[in-house]
Design a protein with these regions (language model features):
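Structural beta-alpha unit
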Residues: 39-42, 65-68, 72-115
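Gly/Ser-rich helix-loop-strand patches that form or flank binding pockets
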Residues: 3, 14-20, 25-26, 94, ...
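Small/aliphatic-rich secondary-structure junction motif
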Residues: 1-60, 140-143, 153-178
Length: 178
């Protein structure tokens, strides 16, 4: 069985990206793992501020209501993922991870055969397509990464980006095995 992982921002689930992944998963005969990443980097990073000429360190601490809202949104995203998997007749597995997204995804890329990510994925609200976060993920990932289209009809062609690095060569070889 192949380990195919689709990456989602736990706070912004996109059901449109799942149609593309469902097609890939059905073709490969495996299940889809939905990795829901909760960005906690803004919570733990203290920041230096100044008031009336005096410096002080400010740390963001979430209230229990804010934490509950984040958890509720994540739970709703996971439920929508599982429901969409049922609609597409594929087996879905949901995993929620908290932390710094770039570190989580680099680590996860070591243990999966393929990652599927929306080119719009961003944890800071960036609107460029693809986002800087996705560019960095493409460079750092240790497995093939497929960018899902906004609207999926069927796969007509596959375009492979190759920068000459060893990791890109390995990713192309892994993709060919899929």
């Amino acid at each position: 069985m192949k380990r195919i992982v689709q990456i989602f921002d736990a706070q912004n689930f996109s059901a449109e990206a799942l149609a593309f992944s469902a097609s890939i998963v059905r073709h490969s005969g495996s299940s889809l793992i939905g990795l829901f990443v909760q960005d906690t980097s803004f919570i733990n990073d203290p920041g230096m501020n100044i008031i009336a000429g005096q410096f002080y360190v400010e740390e963001i601490v979430l209230t229990s209501e804010e934490k509950q809202k984040i958890q509720d949104t994540t739970d709703a995203s996971v439920a929508a993922f599982m429901q969409a998997c049922e609609q597409h007749n594929i087996t879905g597995i949901a995993i929620v991870k908290q932390g710094i997204p770039a570190e989580i995804l680099k680590t996860e890329s070591r243990y999966c055969d393929m990652m599927i990510v929306s080119p719009l994925l961003s944890f800071d609200g960036e609107q460029a397509v693809p986002t800087v976060f996705v560019y960095n993920l493409l460079a750092a990932a240790e497995c093939p990464v497929l960018l899902s289209p906004e609207r999926f009809q069927n796969i007509d062609e596959v375009i492979i980006a190759f920068d000459g690095s060893k990791s890109a060569s390995f990713a192309i070889r892994q993709f060919a095995y899929m």
